[in-house]
């Protein structure tokens, strides 16, 4: 295979098309397509008697439900369906039918044109006016040709579904605005804390950061300009969907240009950094007092921010001593562990101001619980260390921190005072880190206190519920006690009455016993007197007495037997009474049953009579209908004959002349024909024109 090299100079460039004519042709074709679709849908509506444009919002609703189920879950999709269904029901019930159909059709076509690529322009507005005019002038009044009951739910959905989407859109817009407001507030706080941190840095590092930032901005601007120019050169001129291309420049840059611009920015920043280091070595003697002033300003700003941010430190006054101890221990342990990290952040570019998050800034500037405690001690210790380093130059080399051994090569040319100031800044940062740790501890303690408070509140609620239950039980017990007291009073009254009755019965029994004793005494006296008088008859009397006693025993036994028989008879009598009562009830029921049977028989007889009467009436009605049909047929025949006669009369009148003149031309008197209206009888008729059936007059 031979390789064929193409001649690049002979390549043909694509022909440039006129964008204006292309846009006009595309737009006209688009609007013609709209008109054709609209006409076809209206034709289908008229032919099939159904409004097919109402199916488009239903299809949009199904798509939105599917998307919500796919991306937001089943719960949100069910909630969305319920809200849309409720809105549809409200529109279906409270909007009149004609206005509902008008609003639904108008919304569908306006929304269909609104979803195009053109937006609001003169052709779309003209189409909207056309659609609204057709709907209001023609289709608003003509609802007879459509299935109203079938189309009405879809029309209600065409109004209810956009209302629901508008509500969700308004909610998302409000949430978006609130989120932007919150972002702006957080951005302002972050800028404030970044400004504080940048002002706390030495001025030479501020200058270095400012120059690096300007270099990065210049490099980014150059890269954006280059990418924009390349995009303008290589942008396609072919329009899609009737719109001219190349109007929206893309912000994507080429990777080669990005790499070159980044390398150029890095080289410029390195050159400026070396120049600033040389300039710093010559002007370090004049910067030292300004650095001291900046350190004092940084301490003042930190104290001000601590006093501003920690207004809640009064709530933790009882634990202040404990927090001071924790702060001192954590500061002593964290200075050695975080010194290397803080040193790297300080030497890398701005003292860690660019790498820390906004939340980190917030905790760093508002973490000390008492604004006059650890922060003031840290500032005083840093000042004392600074004085010792400035005053004692002999012992400074032997008592240096281990961090000084990690000084990079680009800072060897700096004076020792500046290095010591940087170490002081590192110590301050370590103190800030310790204060952050203490703040985290305090927050954890606050969280634990909050959880304990919640648990105590829940326990308090449970105790309140138990107290309410106990109060209810106590109330019920008091009510039961009162009822028991009332029943006890009633029982005591009954007991007193029974005791009184018992005392009366005992009195009667004692009186009867006394009477019996008196009778027995009198009988004994009489017997003694008789025995005394009749001593001879004692034996016979004794026999008689024994016989009488035997008879008395027999009589008592007979009395007991009779009493048992009487009891049995009483039981039988009671049973007979019950049986008689039952018989009376059965007699009443039988009488009621017989009365009901008589009533039912009477009702059946009356019902049969009514059915006979109804049958007679129906037969009479059928006869009357048949006679009426016969009479109507005769009337129709007569009407047909009258029409034929009228037609014949019209033909005769059309053939014969209307006026007949005599032979005398001088007089020329018109002769009235015999078929003229003058010969008609104008006397009023006695017939009723509104009568359904002809009735002859009675003479």
Swiss-Prot record:
Glycans are attached at residues 241, 267, 345, 365, 690. Pfam families: Macoilin (PF09726). It is a multi-pass membrane protein. The chain crosses the membrane at residues 28-48, 75-95, 120-140, 154-174. Its main location: nucleus. It comes from the Eukaryota. One of its GO terms (cellular component) is nuclear membrane. Keywords: Cell projection, Endoplasmic reticulum, Glycoprotein, Membrane, Nucleus, Transmembrane, Transmembrane helix. One of its GO terms (biological process) is chemotaxis. GO terms for molecular function: microtubule binding. It is found in: Nucleus membrane; Cell projection, Axon; Rough endoplasmic reticulum membrane. Residues 329-346, 366-382 have a biased composition (Low complexity). Residues 219-289, 322-411, 432-451, 679-699 are annotated as: Disordered. Residues 257-271 have a biased composition (Basic and acidic residues). May play a role in the regulation of neuronal activity. Belongs to the macoilin family. This is Macoilin-2. It comes from Danio rerio (Zebrafish).
């Amino acid at each position: 295979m031979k390789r064929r090299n193409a001649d690049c100079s002979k390549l043909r460039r694509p022909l440039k098309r006129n964008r204006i004519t292309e846009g006009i042709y595309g737009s006209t074709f688009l609007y013609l397509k709209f008109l054709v679709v609209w006409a076809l849908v209206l034709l289908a509506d008229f032919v099939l008697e159904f409004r097919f444009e109402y199916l488009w919002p239903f299809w949009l609703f199904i798509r939105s439900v599917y998307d919500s189920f796919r991306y937001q879950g089943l719960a949100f999709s069910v909630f969305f369906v319920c809200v849309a269904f409720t809105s549809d029901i409200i529109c279906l019930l409270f909007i009149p039918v004609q206005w509902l159909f008008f609003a639904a059709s108008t919304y569908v076509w306006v929304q269909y044109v609104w979803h195009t690529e053109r937006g609001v322009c003169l052709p779309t507005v003209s189409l909207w006016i056309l659609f609204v005019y057709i709907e209001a002038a023609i289709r608003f009044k003509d609802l007879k040709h459509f299935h109203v009951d079938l189309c009405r739910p879809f029309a209600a959905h065409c109004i209810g579904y956009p209302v629901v989407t508008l509500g969700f859109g308004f909610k998302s817009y409000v949430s978006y605005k609130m989120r932007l407001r919150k972002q702006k507030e957080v951005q302002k706080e972050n800028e404030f804390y970044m400004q504080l941190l940048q002002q706390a840095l030495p001025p030479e590092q501020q200058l270095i950061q400012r120059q690096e930032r300007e270099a990065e901005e210049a490099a980014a601007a150059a890269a954006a300009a280059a990418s924009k120019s390349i995009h303008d050169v290589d942008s396609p001129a072919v329009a899609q969907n009737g719109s001219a291309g190349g109007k929206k420049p893309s912000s994507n840059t080429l990777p080669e240009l990005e790499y070159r611009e980044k390398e150029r920015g890095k080289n410029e920043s390195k050159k400026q950094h070396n120049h600033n280091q040389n300039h710093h070595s010559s002007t370090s003697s004049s910067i030292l007092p300004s650095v001291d002033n900046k350190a004092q300003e940084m301490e003042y700003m930190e104290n001000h921010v601590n006093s501003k941010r920690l207004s809640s430190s009064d709530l933790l006054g009882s634990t202040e001593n404990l927090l001071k101890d924790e702060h001192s221990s954590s500061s002593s342990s964290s200075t050695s562990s975080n010194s290397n990290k803080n040193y790297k952040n300080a030497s890398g570019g701005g003292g860690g101001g660019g790498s820390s998050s906004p939340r980190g800034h917030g905790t760093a500037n508002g973490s000390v619980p008492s604004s006059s405690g650890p922060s003031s001690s840290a500032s005083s210790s840093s000042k004392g260390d600074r004085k010792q380093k400035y005053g004692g130059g002999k012992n400074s080399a032997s008592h240096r921190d281990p961090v000084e051994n990690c000084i990079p090569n680009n800072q060897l040319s700096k004076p020792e005072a500046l290095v010591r100031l940087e170490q002081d800044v590192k110590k301050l940062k370590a103190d800030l880190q310790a204060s952050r740790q203490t703040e985290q501890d305090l927050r954890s303690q606050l969280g634990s206190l909050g959880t304990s408070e919640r648990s105590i509140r829940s326990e308090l609620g449970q105790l309140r519920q138990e107290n309410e239950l106990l109060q209810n039980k106590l109330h019920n017990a008091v009510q039961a006690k009162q009822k028991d007291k009332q029943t006890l009073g009633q029982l005591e009254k009954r007991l007193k009455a029974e005791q009184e009755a018992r005392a009366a019965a005992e009195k009667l029994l004692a009186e009867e016993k006394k009477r019996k004793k008196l009778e027995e005494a009198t009988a004994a006296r009489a017997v003694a007197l008789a025995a005394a008088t009749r001593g001879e008859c004692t034996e016979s009397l004794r026999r008689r007495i024994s016989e009488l006693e035997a008879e008395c025993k027999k009589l008592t036994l007979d009395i007991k037997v009779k009493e048992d028989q009487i009891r049995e008879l009483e039981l039988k009598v009671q049973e007979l009474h019950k049986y008689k009562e039952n018989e009376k009830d059965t007699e009443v029921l039988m009488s009621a049953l017989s009365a009901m049977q008589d009533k039912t028989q009477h009702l059946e007889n009356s019902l049969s009579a009514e059915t006979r009467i109804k049958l007679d009436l129906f037969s009479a009605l059928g006869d009357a209908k048949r006679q009426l049909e016969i009479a109507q047929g005769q009337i129709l025949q007569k009407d047909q004959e009258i029409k034929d006669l009228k037609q014949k009369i019209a033909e005769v009148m059309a053939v014969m002349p209307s006026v007949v003149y005599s032979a005398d031309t001088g007089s020329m008197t018109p002769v009235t024909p015999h078929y003229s209206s003058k010969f008609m009888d104008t006397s009023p008729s006695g017939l009723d024109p509104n009568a359904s059936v002809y009735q002859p007059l009675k003479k």
